[in-house]
């Protein structure tokens, strides 16, 4: 059972960006909107992100960096932070997953898991 002081829940919605994609060049653009909810008992700051992006051919790309879209938000208990970003893949389908490193008000660092989610061109999956 995880510690109730450090409970971060992450949800993601995705969208295929046809206007920014170039299928003839194997470039498929997607946006994703992430909502990070602090269901814990302590305020927590998002320090960094770690994404694992796997395309439909099994190629894996890892992305690490400080914060999200230039921010390191402080999220109070019961509050949330939402942001949008994007990625380009060489295939019509792929999966993203990862984690955020968080810093609780009491100084404890912990990871918030980002469960795998699918990126797919509409109609690409049957």
UniProtKB/Swiss-Prot annotation:
SUPFAM superfamilies referenced in this protein's UniProt entry, alphabetically: ApaG-like
Domain ApaG: 2-126
Highest taxon, organism lineage: Bacteria
A Pfam family per the record: DUF525
BP GO terms, sorted: error-free translesion synthesis
NCBIfam families linked to this entry: PRK05461.1
HAMAP family: ApaG (MF_00791)
Protein name per Swiss-Prot or TrEMBL: Protein ApaG
